[in-house]
Amino acid sequence: MKMSFSKSCLSVLLLSFCLVLISAEIAIAQKSIVADHPVNFRVEPPSWWAGMNNPELQLLVYGLDIASTDVNFSYPGITLKKKHLAENPNYMFLDLELAPDLKPGSFAIKFMRGKKAAYSYNYVIAERAPGSAMRKGFGREDVVYLLMPDRFANGDPSNDNMPGMLETANRSNPVGRHGGDIAGIRKHLDYIEELGMTAIWINPLLENNNPAYSYHGYAITDFYKIDPRFGTNSDYVALVNDAHAKGLKVIKDMIFNHCGINHWFINDLPM
């Protein structure tokens, strides 16, 4: 009985010691992940608009040990209602309330440790385009042209292979990237219009920086940036303007229930 009790105690002590070691290794690894992370500080959404119908805005903030900082900012018409912390101390969520008379502009959000700003972010409140709230979506009266941008038309071969992108174009690979882009779509708007279409549904154009199998666009790694192999955010705006000038609606394909394996927060999850 004595021997059995001693063995049990020893087992518990060994298990406890192992758990302490594992916990320490996880903590060290977590800090190492953030220190080596390509995105050491981030605020999403990176900007917003004045005059939105919903007065609530939540910001996701990421930075090393951001949870230990105090938030400091001052801007007329914006109030910090609540700060949420996650299990991971590298995350913070800010609930902001926007006044109906909020004016466009910018302000510094400072994340303070004592009297020193550990991080600072210049947040832009843009002016909303006139008539934005009156936009009409697509309906049963529309004839929709669905296209996959990588497979549609290559209007700018110079962006087929871009610095920092893990996959390069290879038209001989049936599941690889083939080089289609926003420029190719813009050059073929007349073709789509002549078919009798009234709307274009474009598969996601946002960044899919994965080593393979992401030509379809549904493995997003940045929800706020057009994939450079398709073009730029400005190119997308120009595409929409060109389409509208021809009476074509543009349906933005958004994916909210998953992301690509190389999305920045996958290596350091909030929970």
For every predicted segment, state its role.
Residues 25-29:
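Sec/Tat signal peptide C-region and signal peptidase I cleavage site
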Residues 30, 52-115:
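Immunoglobulin-like IPT/TIG beta-sandwich domains and homologous Ig-like subdomains
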Residues 11-24:
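Bacterial N-terminal signal peptides
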Residues 2-14:
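Bacterial N-terminal signal peptides that target proteins for export
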Residues 30-68, 121-130, 134-135:
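Beta-strand/beta-sandwich contexts
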Residues 255:
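Conserved strand-turn element in the central/C-terminal portion of the radical SAM core barrel
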Residues 115-229, 233-248, 258-259, 264-267:
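N-terminal structural segment of carbohydrate-active enzymes
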